């Protein structure tokens, strides 16, 4: 009889009580062909430890928030001090003001900000606000860009087709997504066609300025600036979903790198230091439409709770220190350069790229441009799954999906990066 690991046992038990055994689908490891996920016991610095005491170099970082590494001493101390004063008040607290001021200081395109509990809440609220502000209903999103699981976002276009949205999850009525239009990332022609057809009906464009849910795809040929221009020409709002990229690719987010000013920005992940949080913010004249200042309703029992606010304040204080982002970027660049050199040495079809503390792995030649969701079909997903399994078995924890970006933290050491490169080199050599 096969001896089962504690993770296998826990997964079997979890499936009796939790649909699919997990509380977010990608965690089940099904997309990478694994029979069971690893159940984590604790984490510290750059490492995860599972319930079988296996140690992993973690390149997920809780899907982005752990930019300082797990259990940063200063963040933990701040949280522990706040815990003694209460977990949640259901009333305003000073920490909300302090975190709002810090975000606005670091992202000057945001003049006012509202805190929520997740990235999904942030994008959902931003869309509602944009519709109310413009008195229009239709929105444009991009194929392959993920903005949470609100009904209006669970839409995909046909292959290369421009069409009215069709829901791609059961339970989402067609009437809910009939006003969601889908375009192709990095393709201005698809955007122009939608504006020609629905010119006075489009409330906003929502976009990941760097598409981190298509692995990691950068905007090409001034794509973001062109989105800004077409929104201005048609009195539509531009929303940057920086839940993933905010305070991760740069201190001022992707908008500071590309020098494009959105009307609204959504945030999450890093601003909570590992605690559940989200936020949306932007121009004051727009944000003043949010209740109780204006008529657009948004509320939440745990919004702005003092624990998440405290963790966020300390995290942003630390990542604001001079030189930290230079060091973070150097770590990611060392990893990416090492992986690319290893692949080149063995003529292996692979390339990686990075920006700030975020990176993407593509299992195809660097001569193949991957600039759209359709382009991802050119990559070898089966080979990624094999790579994932090999790295996991050897103590490296990567995102369990070829469509997800990876994250590095300030806690990753040169030794961690070198071990990762050495393992990848061996895989490239053997495959």
From Swiss-Prot:
Pathway: Porphyrin-containing compound metabolism; protoporphyrin-IX biosynthesis; 5-aminolevulinate from L-glutamyl-tRNA(Glu): step 2/2. The keyword Isomerase applies. Its cofactor is pyridoxal 5'-phosphate. SUPFAM superfamilies: PLP-dependent transferases (SSF53383). Keywords: Cytoplasm, Isomerase, Porphyrin biosynthesis, Pyridoxal phosphate. The modification N6-(pyridoxal phosphate)lysine is found at residue 269. GO terms for molecular function: glutamate-1-semialdehyde 2,1-aminomutase activity; pyridoxal phosphate binding; transaminase activity. Its main location: cytoplasm. PROSITE patterns: AA_TRANSFER_CLASS_3. It is an enzyme of class 5 (isomerase). It catalyses: (S)-4-amino-5-oxopentanoate = 5-aminolevulinate. Transmembrane segments: none annotated. GO terms for cellular component: cytoplasm. GO terms for biological process: protoporphyrinogen IX biosynthetic process. Disulfide bonds: none annotated. It is found in: Cytoplasm. Homodimer. This is Glutamate-1-semialdehyde 2,1-aminomutase. It comes from Francisella tularensis subsp. tularensis (strain WY96-3418). The lineage of its organism: Bacteria, Pseudomonadati, Pseudomonadota, Gammaproteobacteria, Thiotrichales.
């Amino acid at each position: 009889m096969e001896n089962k690991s504690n993770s296998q046992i826990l997964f079997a038990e979890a499936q009796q009580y939790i649909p699919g055994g997990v509380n977010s689908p990608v965690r089940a490891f099904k997309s990478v062909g694994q029979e069971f996920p690893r159940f984590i016991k604790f984490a510290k610095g750059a490492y995860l430890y599972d319930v079988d005491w296996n140690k992993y170099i973690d390149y997920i970082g809780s899907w982005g928030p752990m930019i300082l590494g797990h259990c940063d001493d200063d963040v933990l101390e701040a949280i522990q001090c706040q815990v003694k004063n209460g977990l949640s008040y259901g009333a305003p607290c000073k920490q909300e003001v302090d975190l709002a001021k810090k975000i606005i200081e670091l992202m000057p395109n945001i003049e006012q900000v509202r805190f929520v509990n997740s990235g999904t809440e942030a994008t959902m609220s931003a869309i509602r606000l944009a519709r109310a502000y413009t008195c229009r209903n239709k929105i444009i999103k991009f194929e392959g860009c993920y903005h949470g699981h609100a009904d209006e976002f669970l839409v995909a276009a046909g292959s290369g087709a421009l069409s009215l949205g069709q829901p791609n999850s059961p339970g989402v009525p067609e009437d809910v997504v009939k006003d969601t239009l889908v375009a192709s990332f990095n393709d201005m022609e698809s955007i122009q066609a939608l504006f020609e057809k629905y010119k006075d009906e489009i409330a906003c464009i929502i976009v990941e300025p760097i598409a981190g849910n298509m692995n990691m795809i950068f905007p090409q040929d001034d794509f973001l600036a062109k989105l800004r221009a077409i929104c201005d020409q048609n009195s539509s709002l531009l929303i940057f979903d920086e839940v993933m990229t905010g305070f991760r690719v740069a201190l001022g987010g992707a908008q500071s790198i590309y020098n494009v000013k959105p009307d609204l920005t959504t945030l999450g992940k890093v601003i909570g230091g590992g605690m559940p949080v989200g936020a949306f913010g932007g121009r004051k004249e727009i944000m003043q439409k949010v209740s109780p200042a204006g008529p657009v309703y948004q509320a939440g029992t745990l919004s702005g709770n003092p624990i998440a606010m405290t963790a966020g304040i300390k995290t942003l204080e630390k990542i604001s220190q001079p030189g930290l982002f230079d060091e973070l970027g150097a770590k990611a660049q060392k990893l990416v350069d090492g992986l690319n050199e290893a692949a080149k040495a063995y003529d292996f079809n692979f390339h990686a790229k990075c920006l700030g503390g975020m990176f993407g792995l593509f299992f195809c030649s660097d001569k193949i441009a991957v600039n759209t969701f359709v382009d991802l079909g050119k990559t070898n997903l089966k080979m990624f799954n094999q790579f994932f399994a090999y790295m996991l078995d050897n103590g490296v924890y990567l995102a369990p999906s070829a469509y997800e970006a990876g994250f590095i933290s300030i806690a990753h050491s040169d030794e961690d990066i070198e071990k990762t490169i050495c393992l990848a080199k061996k895989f490239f050599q053997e495959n």
